[in-house]
């Protein structure tokens, strides 16, 4: 009887907290962490066991090491989804098979389809890494909400890298741009222009910082299960 009463009490507390969060959502005052809490409470009330599957969202410019890290996470069991590879599959080479000025227009439906695939994978219990840069705070918030709606846990990883390092990598990659979906050709002027548009995450966007070691980053991601949502992989 005591166990039943305890369960009933816990359910009542969860329902009350869920009501508070939903009122905050209607008032447009709900934080990103609040959205995650809604997802977790809803999962608990529905009887789904275990922690929420994670979706790794990366933020960084070209040449920062996103694909290297994403492939390491894929080897560790995450499902890797890459918009650039899907763009190459659908449309061919950027600047040869379609004009450079059409990239964003063509990318929009690709990102929409990948967002849907992310939700489907999370709903099935799979963990996901999105091999993409997510340059702006607004874009990151939208994708985090997409993850939360599917019952997943968004984990943001920031990949800072000096311009000189990125440009050296891009120069080497440019030679493969006609055959490699992950080697889109960019000039140094492109990189400098894009850097001015990039919004690095601040302390109010919980994130991990990648320092170039995939193994250390995987360990840091595992520690997010214990509630450490900010930090540097070391």
Provide a role label for each language-model segment.
Residues 58:
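Hydrophobic anchor at the beta1->P-loop junction of P-loop NTPases
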Residues 22-47:
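N-terminal pre-Walker A segment at the start of P-loop NTPase domains
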Residues 61-62:
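The conserved Walker
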Residues 30, 105-154:
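Glycine-rich phosphate-binding loop used to anchor ATP phosphates in small-molecule kinases
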Residues 65:
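Conserved glycine(s) of the Walker
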Residues 150-170:
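Conserved phosphate-donor/acceptor-positioning beta-strand/loop module used by diverse small-molecule
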Residues 68-126:
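Conserved substrate/cofactor phosphate-moiety recognition/catalytic segment
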Residues 176-227:
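Small-molecule kinase domains that catalyze NTP-dependent phosphoryl transfer to phosphate-bearing small molecules
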């Amino acid at each position: 009887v005591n166990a039943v009463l305890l369960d009933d009490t816990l359910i009542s507390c969860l329902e009350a907290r869920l009501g508070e969060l939903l009122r905050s959502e209607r008032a447009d005052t709900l934080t990103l962490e609040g959205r995650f809490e809604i997802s977790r409470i809803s999962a608990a009330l529905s009887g789904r066991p275990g922690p929420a599957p994670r979706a790794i969202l990366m933020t960084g410019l070209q040449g920062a090491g996103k694909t290297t890290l994403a492939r390491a996470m894929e080897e560790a069991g995450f499902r890797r989804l890459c918009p650039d590879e899907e763009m190459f599959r659908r449309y061919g080479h950027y600047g040869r098979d379609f004009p450079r000025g059409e990239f964003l227009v063509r990318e929009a439906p690709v990102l929409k389809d990948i967002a849907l695939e992310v939700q489907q994978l999370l709903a099935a219990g799979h963990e996901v890494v999105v091999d993409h840069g997510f340059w702006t705070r607004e874009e990151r918030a939208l994708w985090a909400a997409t993850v939360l709606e599917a019952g997943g846990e968004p984990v943001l990883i920031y990949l800072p890298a000096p311009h000189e390092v990125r440009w050296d990598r891009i120069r080497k990659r440019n030679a493969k741009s006609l055959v490699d979906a992950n080697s889109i050709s960019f000039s140094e002027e492109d990189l400098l222009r894009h850097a001015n548009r990039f919004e690095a995450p601040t302390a109010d966007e919980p994130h991990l910082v990648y320092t170039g070691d995939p193994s250390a980053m995987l360990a840091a991601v595992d520690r997010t299960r214990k509630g450490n949502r900010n930090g540097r992989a070391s």
